């Protein structure tokens, strides 16, 4: 029997991916204050630190626990800047104006914590957006509801704005499943054992 998996995230996309792969889990959202981690120019180091701190925060809420705690963090990186979730609609509009007709990176780092042993892994995918007309940006944000998405777009509802996706689409959604598989293998756990 596999160890219980605790998802330390309220992300609907991460939940969806685990459900899609029939991985049973419980949710204990991390209440970690992300502003405690400052960005120093390295998107991978930044997201790994955030994922790690979220895992530690969940372990404090759910201790002691003979379980696997899984957390993650996703950002968009372009031209030396990072884009997280927009603060408001005006911020979302500005993000899409910056990212349109460009190729940018989507970086997701995940952390797996078990009995004090922390493992982190990252994946980067490239996304190219189309030249979204100014008069379509606001309607896209309103229709799709992208204020909860880093970069202010949703790859699952990107039909008219996505030109190209290079890399793992699960990474873009917030949970690179192969990275999770490799991290669990380092703990001698096979992700296949979780699938029903």
Swiss-Prot record:
Keyword Phosphoprotein: no
InterPro entries linked: ITPase-like_fam, Maf-like
EC number: 3.6.1.9
Disulfide bonds listed in the record: none
Cofactor section: a divalent metal cation
Protein location: Cytoplasm
Any one GO molecular-function label of the UniProt entry: nucleoside triphosphate diphosphatase activity
Active site, UniProt feature: 73
Presence of keyword Plastid: no
HAMAP family: Maf
Protein's name in the database: Nucleoside triphosphate pyrophosphatase
Organism: Chlamydia pneumoniae
């Amino acid at each position: 029997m596999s160890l219980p998996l605790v998802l330390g995230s309220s992300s609907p996309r991460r939940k969806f991916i685990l459900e899609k792969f029939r991985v049973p889990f419980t949710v204990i959202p991390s209440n970690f204050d992300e502003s405690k981690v400052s960005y120093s120019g390295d998107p991978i180091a930044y997201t790994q630190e955030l994922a790690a701190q979220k895992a530690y925060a969940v372990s404090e809420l759910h201790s002691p626990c003979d379980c696997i705690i899984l957390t993650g963090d996703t950002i968009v990186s372009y031209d030396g800047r990072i884009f997280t979730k927009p603060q408001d609609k005006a911020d979302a509009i500005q993000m899409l104006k910056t990212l349109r007709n460009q190729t940018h990176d989507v970086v997701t780092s995940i952390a797996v914590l078990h009995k004090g042993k922390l493992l982190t892994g990252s994946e980067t995918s490239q996304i190219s957006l189309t030249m979204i007309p100014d008069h379509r940006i606001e309607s896209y944000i309103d229709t799709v509801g992208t204020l909860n998405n880093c970069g202010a777009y949703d790859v699952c509802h990107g039909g008219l704005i996505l030109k190209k996706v290079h890399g793992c689409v699960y990474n873009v959604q917030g949970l690179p499943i192969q990275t999770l598989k490799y991290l669990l293998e380092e703990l001698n756990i096979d992700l296949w054992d979780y699938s029903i």
